[in-house]
């Protein structure tokens, strides 16, 4: 008799009526009377537990089993009984239960519901709850979706370095890397990467279509529901691409990911629809069945001015060209005005990074942010400045010394046939929040790192 997994039983139980099976796993709950007991049994291969029925008359260790602490590991030998009239499609009538590992009674995740903060304090255990089992399953499939998209579209996967000598965003929010035995280990200042973009740009000149996917680090002291100190970014880069084609690529990429989740994580999405965000399935269908609008930054400013005049309450009410849009403004645009993801394009140069291509008006850059309801910005991209002189001028305007900041190599790319390039950075956890209905980014990553917290 071979060991079988719940995942396989869910697919084949109707053909296994009366068949003897062996399962190994733990239980989420147990209840018993004097003669019969019921175990909610899980082996981590499926979301919902299987009911194990055990009786005193044929279970010599009935009393021991009945008193086992939650999360104890057991081996169950029993018979498959289909139960179409009950909530669960089948159950296992046990003939033998062996205790493999008894859990300590102090196990924190008892049968009662637990709050999000409590679960964050027990991040090493929270994957055993339905919520985090579902979110992390979707996270895995979401990553697979992007790999499939880029593979199908002939992108090369580039492993960008995690230790760098520059801050590609120029925001001064990088973590410094220092060897305790040799402070001058690299011969220059070293930092954890804030973006894989520069490496992607270099490789796009050799392979045309590339992408990076890895962790990035920001030394921000933000305590919001959308910020982490360590998070994952998807950063494609395509040579010869302009801003218009870039928005098309972003839209195709996001829609492919959602289609993929419908194919490979539909039960998990349905769980999220029932437990995290009612209407989630309809929202995602609306995303894949409609175009993402494109709206100019200048038009956004006029929309916001009109909203203020009509009495809409923003915390930041001084709406003017050149302002950096706040989350409240972004969400108003995508939630109240367009009611779906929307591209804002051609931002003022003073609120965007130095490497973005200057438009002919000399005021704006060929940049875009994709704004999503409930989240705000989930993706930012741009056409890159391809003129060496313009890029150097922009650096000097922002007091960025290419030599001092180890950026000369990046500028030098423009000397050697760098005609045009565009790319974007998509916050993986933010998109995961959007497709699951998860309301805090700290719950969209296995072990969250943020200011003041490093427990695991």
UniProtKB/Swiss-Prot annotation:
Name of the molecule in the record: Asparagine--tRNA ligase
Single GO molecular function: asparagine-tRNA ligase activity
CDD domains: AsxRS_core, EcAsnRS_like_N
Source organism superkingdom: Bacteria
Name of the gene this protein is made from: asnS
Cellular component aspect of the GO annotation: cytoplasm
Reactions mediated catalytically: tRNA(Asn) + L-asparagine + ATP = L-asparaginyl-tRNA(Asn) + AMP + diphosphate + H(+)
Coiled-coil region(s): none
Keywords, comma-separated and alphabetical: Aminoacyl-tRNA synthetase, ATP-binding, Cytoplasm, Ligase, Nucleotide-binding, Protein biosynthesis
Keyword ATP-binding: yes
EC nos: 6.1.1.22
Subunit structure: Homodimer.
InterPro entries for the chain: Aa-tRNA-synt_II, aa-tRNA-synth_II, aa-tRNA-synth_II/BPL/LPL, Asn-tRNA-ligase, Asp/Asn-tRNA-synth_IIb, NA-bd_OB-fold, NA-bd_OB_tRNA
Pfam families linked to this entry: tRNA-synt_2 (PF00152), tRNA_anti-codon (PF01336)
Enzyme class: ligase
